[in-house]
């Protein structure tokens, strides 16, 4: 068997970016055959991807792609903030969102099956994702995407890599860009009060009613007069209407000029916003939190069991 030299290990590491000792083991197992060693590492990297698949991915990036009146917005998740700055991870995210815009996949499974190669992995986007899991050592996943091709003009805004907005509009592009920035900052849930989901309205009405009941209980305990049912009903409805104004885009005070609402700004610029989409990284994902001491203890326990 040919001697395994440091230069051979370095060459294999340069091709695969695998840990040094794994490269040495692969070369030893392959008896110095570089091609076979690379294949062995591909298998090992794939097994790493399988082990990582169950881990929570609450970090990540939002990325967008716009070309004429077609665009896409995508969330790609990973386990730690550190990986969000990795060039290979970012290249995967940017390539994927472009593929969405250009190929119109029906769902995440169709997206994963699209042809794509990167960093020696392929021939599909899913193969690259799995390969990078092994290479980087963290789970990563495509969480959600939306493609825009309604014929409306598009304006997008990314706040760093954690918040992404796409606005579908007719009219002034600068005004639409300002609206996208406003959405990122103020996070409305609907265009108008009428568009706010019924379950959110019901929840807010329930909160307002509970607050009114609590106030009545406090007043009774203090020997003070309790408000009439009519006044209480008006208070509850007033609270709901206040909430609707706070969460509907058109009724919000414009973030760049709080003397006017977004609706007033749009009217002044001759712009119509037809829809907006807001993505925030990790929204709705329960993030696993462990203190460092507990993490070290868990690793030591796992190592002891393995030995």
From Swiss-Prot:
CDD domains: UBA_EF-Ts (cd14275)
Annotated spans, Involved in Mg(2+) ion dislocation from EF-Tu: 80-83
Key word Metal-binding present: no
Top-rank taxon: Bacteria
Cellular component annotations (GO), alphabetically ordered: cytoplasm
Pfam families: EF_TS
Subcellular location: Cytoplasm
UniProtKB keywords: Cytoplasm, Elongation factor, Protein biosynthesis
Gene Ontology terms, MF aspect: translation elongation factor activity
Family: Belongs to the EF-Ts family.
Function: Associates with the EF-Tu.GDP complex and induces the exchange of GDP to GTP. It remains bound to the aminoacyl-tRNA.EF-Tu.GTP complex up to the GTP hydrolysis stage on the ribosome.
NCBIfam families referenced in this protein's UniProt entry, alphabetically: tsf (TIGR00116)
Protein name per its UniProtKB record: Elongation factor Ts
Source species of the chain: Albidiferax ferrireducens (strain ATCC BAA-621 / DSM 15236 / T118)
């Amino acid at each position: 068997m040919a001697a395994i030299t440091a230069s051979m290990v370095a060459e294999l590491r340069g091709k695969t970016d695998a840990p040094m000792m794994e490269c040495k083991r692969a070369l030893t197992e392959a008896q110095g055959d570089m091609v076979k060693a690379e294949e062995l590492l591909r298998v090992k990297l794939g097994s790493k991807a399988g082990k990582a698949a169950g881990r929570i991915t609450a970090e990540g990036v939002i990325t967008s792609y716009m070309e004429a009146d077609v665009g896409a917005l995508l969330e790609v998740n990973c386990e730690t903030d550190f990986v969000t700055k990795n060039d290979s991870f970012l290249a995967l995210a940017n390539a994927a969102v472009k593929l969405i815009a250009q190929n119109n996949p029906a769902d995440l499974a169709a997206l994963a099956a699209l042809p794509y190669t990167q960093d020696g992995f392929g021939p599909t986007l899913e193969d690259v994702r799995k390969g990078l899991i092994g290479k980087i050592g963290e789970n990563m996943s495509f969480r959600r995407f939306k493609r825009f091709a309604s014929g409306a003009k598009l304006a997008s805004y990314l706040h760093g890599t954690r918040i992404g907005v796409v606005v579908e509009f007719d009219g002034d592009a600068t005004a639409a860009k300002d609206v996208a920035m406003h959405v990122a900052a103020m996070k409305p849930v609907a265009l108008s009060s009428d568009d706010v989901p019924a379950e959110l309205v019901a929840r807010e009405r329930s909160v307002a009613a509970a607050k009114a009941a609590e106030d009545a209980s406090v007043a009774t305990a203090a020997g003070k007069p309790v408000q009439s049912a009519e006044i209480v009903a008006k208070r509850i409805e007033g609270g709901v209407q206040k909430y609707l104004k706070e969460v509907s885009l058109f009724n919000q005070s414009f973030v760049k000029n709080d003397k006017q609402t977004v609706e007033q700004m749009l009217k002044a610029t001759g712009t119509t916003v037809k829809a907006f989409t807001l993505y925030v990284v990790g929204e709705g994902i329960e993030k696993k939190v462990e203190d460092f001491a507990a993490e070290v203890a868990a690793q030591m326990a796992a190592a002891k069991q393995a030995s």
